[in-house]
Every structure is written in structure tokens, then in C-alpha cells.
């Protein structure tokens, strides 16, 4: 039960951090206070960092809801392409050519 609650709290913190309601630094400080040093703490901190860097809901090179492409078109660019969790305008993935 305790591990399930921990996962729910972590997912809630990631969601709040990625929405910009609180910043990543505060979530990282919370994890530093609550978790002992070790592999799990490092993995969770890495996961929070990756989730907080997310732009336009890009995940695993996929524009999940079309926000990347729409944002680039608003800027006058031809196409938006997800590179991991980042959105880049008019820059194709080099390994998919």
C-alpha cells in the first residue's frame, strides 16, 4: 500500500511540475528530503527532470496531440517535429531520412 501511495504522489508531482504550477527545483528538493540516497532516488529524480523538460506534449519522438506542429505553424514554420521530449521547427530527425 505504501509503495502505491508513493507512486501516486510522484505522478502527481510530475504532473504539477510539467504544467508549470510548481517548478522542477521544488519537486527535486521534496525528493531529496523524503527519499534515502540510492538507485531509486536517482531514477526518480531523472524521471522528474525528463518530465519537466517536456515541450508541447512530445513523448518518445511522437507529437501526441499535435501541439508541436500547431505551435511551429503559428510561428510561420513549415512543420514541427518532436525530438525526444523537445519540439523543433523544420528540423527532421537525422536517423529517419
From Swiss-Prot:
Disulfide bonds join 58-82, 68-87, 72-89. Keywords: Disulfide bond, Ion channel impairing toxin, Potassium channel impairing toxin, Secreted, Signal, Toxin, Voltage-gated potassium channel impairing toxin. Residues 1-19 form the signal peptide. It holds the Pfam family Scorpion_toxin_alpha-beta. GO terms for molecular function: potassium channel regulator activity; toxin activity. The keyword Transport does not apply. InterPro entries: Long_scorpion_toxin_alpha/beta. Promising broad-spectrum antiviral agent that functions by alkalizing acidic organelles in host cells, which prevents viral genome release from endosomes and restricts viral entry. Is effective at noncytotoxic concentrations against viruses that enter host cells through low pH-dependent fusion, including dengue virus type 2 (DENV-2), hepatitis C virus (HCV), Zika virus (ZIKV), and herpes simplex virus type 1 (HSV-1). Due to its specific mechanism of action and broad-spectrum effectiveness, is a potential candidate for development as an antiviral drug. Belongs to the long chain scorpion toxin family. Class 3 subfamily. Negative results: does not block Kv1.1/KCNA1 and Kv1.2/KCNA2 channels. Neither the full-length toxin nor the two individual domains (N-terminal (1-36) and C-terminal (37-78) domains) show any cytolytic effects on bacteria or red blood cells. Selectively inhibits Kv1.3/KCNA3 channel (IC(50)=0.95 uM). Both N-terminal and C-terminal domains are likely involved in the interaction with Kv1.3/KCNA3, since neither its N-terminal domain (1-36) nor its C-terminal domain (37-78) block Kv1.3/KCNA3 channel. This is Scorpine-like peptide Ev37.
Amino acid at each position: 500500500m505504501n509503495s502505491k501511495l508513493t507512486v501516486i504522489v510522484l505522478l502527481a508531482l510530475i504532473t504539477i511540475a510539467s504544467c508549470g504550477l510548481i517548478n522542477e527545483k521544488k519537486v527535486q528538493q521534496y525528493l531529496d528530503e523524503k527519499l534515502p540516497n540510492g538507485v531509486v532516488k536517482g531514477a526518480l529524480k531523472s524521471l522528474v527532470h525528463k518530465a519537466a523538460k517536456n515541450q508541447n506534449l512530445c513523448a518518445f519522438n511522437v507529437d501526441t496531440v499535435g501541439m508541436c506542429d500547431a505551435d511551429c505553424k503559428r510561428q510561420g514554420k513549415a512543420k514541427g517535429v518532436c525530438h525526444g521530449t523537445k519540439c523543433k521547427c523544420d528540423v527532421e530527425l537525422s536517423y529517419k531520412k
